[in-house]
Amino acid sequence: MSIRDWPEAERPREKLLEQGAAALSDAELLAIFLRTGVTGCSAVELSRRLLSEFGGLRALLEADLASFCGHLGLGVAKYAQLQAVLEMGRRHLAERLRRDSILESPQAVRDYLKARLRHEQHEVFACLFLDTRHRVLAFEVLFQGSIDGASVYPRQVVKRTLAHNAAALILTHNHPSGDARPSLADRQLTARLKEALALIDVRVLDHFIIGDGEPLSLAEYGWL
């Protein structure tokens, strides 16, 4: 049965307009994005099938072009649309972050870092550079690969801090495994960077580790 034949209150688009996007299931949201199904399969049914094949919404959103287009109902045009939507979301979060001091919008910081790093398949280390009023100057990825004491160079972090004329930093890196708990190496690296930046009177406000859930704050655990 086509979605057009469903009761109006159950159609994804009408339901979104009536109740808001948060009221929709993953399959219903995806169905609105897809717009149409395939022969013998409504957009919602196709969405459920795709979510099952990918193993969930996150895997679908993070799929590369070849993987994405290897599924029925998906192609290059949809992939391009999806990447544009995801990038608009990241830019929206970045604008929110730049408007105010990060101390006034701590959740915006977490949301932004999640959007930037959660999809990465390999470890990525980045810095959020802040001015004297703790407003964002820049976000920059500095290192990629295995993030440990041997691969992250304090002198490079100091160099980029001076280039941005930053007064404070937020450090961040992701754990592709999804487990955000810090390793001993993570804590040692944080201490080394804090010490190096203190020499130029720059504060490290926090170090967030991005996993599957909410970003883990080393400062909140007293590890900074």
Curated annotation (Swiss-Prot):
Binding residues annotated for Zn(2+), in chain numbering: H173, H175, D186
Pfam families in the cross-refs: RadC, UPF0758_N
SUPFAM superfamilies: JAB1/MPN domain, RuvA domain 2-like
InterPro entries registered for this protein in UniProt: MPN, RadC_JAB, RuvA_2-like, UPF0758, UPF0758_CS, UPF0758_N
GO biological process: proteolysis
MPN domain sequence ranges: 102-224
Highest taxon listed in the record's lineage: Bacteria
Chain ranges for the short sequence motif JAMM motif as given in the UniProt record: 173-186
Alphabetized UniProt keyword annotations: Hydrolase, Metal-binding, Metalloprotease, Protease, Zinc
Annotated S-S bridges: none
GO MF assignments: metal ion binding; metallopeptidase activity
Keyword Cell cycle carried by entry: no
Family: Belongs to the UPF0758 family.
Protein name as catalogued: UPF0758 protein PLES_57141
Organism of origin: Pseudomonas aeruginosa (strain LESB58)
